[in-house]
Swiss-Prot record:
Enzyme class name: hydrolase
Annotated Mg(2+) 1 binding sites: T23, S46
Nucleus keyword on record: no
Pfam families referenced in this protein's UniProt entry, alphabetically: eIF2_C, GTP_EFTU
Residue span of region G2: 44-48
EC number, UniProt record: 3.6.5.3
Protein name listed in UniProt: Translation initiation factor 2 subunit gamma
Names of required cofactors: Mg(2+)
CDD domains documented for this protein: eIF2_gamma, eIF2_gamma_III
Chain residues that bind Mg(2+) 2: D19, G44
Residues covered by region (G3): 91-94
Region listing for G1, in residue ranges: 16-23
């Protein structure tokens, strides 16, 4: 098939409670483990956002939905399969302490698979919290994977299915298909692919627009001990939501980095050039919008190591949205805390309280400088780059962790 079909064209999130099998399902669909961080391997949970690309295929000799596969050759007919499309999976951590990471990943998602373990009551805390996050951020294209059906009998699976249906009633996932699957045994993977093809279409994007890249990760790919002359520039990982990128293009990153001058500190944009591009696991000369992308730059790798540039927005100089050190937002609070056993009521936001805010892929802490009915003003510890009208996930400190309490809409600056 033509190479252009192999570049990922849509981002699909895997969300849900910890240990319900999100990462295992990504492996069944892509052949890749997204848990590569040493602490993740040791603890058996996702800590950072994980990424993997998968080329979805169909056998021309099989009927639907059995025709769908990720194999290049149909095991039943021994015929070459045809490429449908390549997708990028964003594997979000399900642990309650990593909600900010999940929210930053949700900004990249065009659709999502809500993974629900068939061997536990529904909903588990982060099942509920992640579904609410999808609703807040505006992700409507959802598939529900009822995973681990190999661990329960038919009656238990049926009861779990009914619990899922009752749980999603009245939510953004009310009409989402529920697909029984065993990611570990790779059972019903064809049904999952069929649901992805039906429910999560590739969005219409504008390749003629200015490039706009949301950064979710950044890396120093140089090995320790590399000679100065052999050092490569820092790498940014994220999603191109508009426009096209080519090697040699100039990029501006906002909010940039903090610099100190004359005893004062301020945030200044960073400019660089595109040295290399990687999409779908391959080096490419140009990248179209959609899917996940690695951008090799001319930046000093010390600026990009350890996800230091996660949350940045990149595009041609002068084309980016404003950078905000404070802003006003309209606020829509949830009625109760999701994921809490007691369903605690949510109090109004008050002046002086700290909030954790996720805007795009950026997460920052803001101090409320003014609070009124349905709106508030916040001063940010770390500025963000975002257009007016951007959606903001609002988290409040409750006990020992940040809890999702509502959604904001950015209106204007101080």
């Amino acid at each position: 098939m033509a190479d252009e079909h192999r570049q990922p064209e849509v981002n699909i999130g895997l969300v849900g409670h910890v240990d319900h099998g999100k990462t295992t399902l990504v492996r069944a669909l892509s052949g890749e483990w997204t848990d590569q961080h040493s602490e993740e391997m040791k603890r058996g949970i996702s800590i950072r956002l994980g990424y993997a690309d998968a080329t979805l295929r169909r056998c021309p000799d099989c009927d639907e939905p059995e025709c769908y596969t990720v194999a290049e050759t149909c095991p039943e007919h021994d015929t070459a399969t045809e490429i449908e499309r390549t997708v990028s999976f964003v594997d979000a951590p399900g642990h309650e302490t990593l909600m900010a990471t999940m929210l930053s990943g949700a900004a990249l998602m065009d659709g999502a698979v809500l993974v629900v373990g068939a061997n536990e009551p529904v909903p588990q805390p982060q099942t509920e919290e992640h579904l609410m996050a999808l609703d807040i951020i505006g992700i409507e294209n959802i598939v529900i994977a009822q995973n681990k059906v190999d661990l329960v009998d038919a009656e238990e699976a049926r009861q779990n299915y009914e619990e899922i249906q009752a749980f999603v009633e009245g939510t953004v996932a009310e009409d989402a298909p529920v697909v029984p699957v065993s990611a570990e045994q790779e059972i019903n993977v064809d049904l999952v692919i069929d649901a992805l093809q039906t429910e999560i279409a590739t969005p219409d994007r504008d390749p003629s627009a200015d490039p706009l890249l949301y950064a979710a990760r950044s890396f120093d790919i140089n090995r320790p001990g590399t000679e100065w002359g052999g050092l490569l520039g820092g790498v940014i990982g994220g999603s191109l939501v508009d426009g096209e990128l080519e090697a040699g293009d100039e990029l501006e990153l906002r909010p940039g980095r903090e610099v100190e001058e004359g005893g004062k500190t301020e945030w200044r944009p960073v400019t660089t050039d595109v040295r290399s591009l990687q999409a779908g696991g391959e080096d490419v000369d140009s990248a179209s919008p959609g899917g996940l992308l690695g951008v090799g730059t001319g930046l000093d790798p010390s600026l990009t190591k350890g996800d230091a540039l996660a949350g940045q927005v990149a595009g041609p100089p002068g084309s980016l949205p404003p950078t905000w050190e404070s802003f006003e937002m309209d606020v829509d609070l949830l009625e109760r805390l999701v994921g809490a056993a007691d369903g605690e009521q949510i109090d109004d936001i008050s002046t002086g309280e700290p909030l954790m805010l996720t805007v795009g892929t950026a997460t920052t802490v803001g101090s409320v400088t003014s609070a009124r009915d349905g709106e508030c003003e916040v001063a940010l510890k770390r500025p963000v780059c975002a257009p007016a009208g951007a959606k903001i996930a609002i988290n409040r400190r409750v006990g020992a962790r940040w809890r999702l309490i509502g959604v904001g809409t950015l209106t204007e600056s101080e």
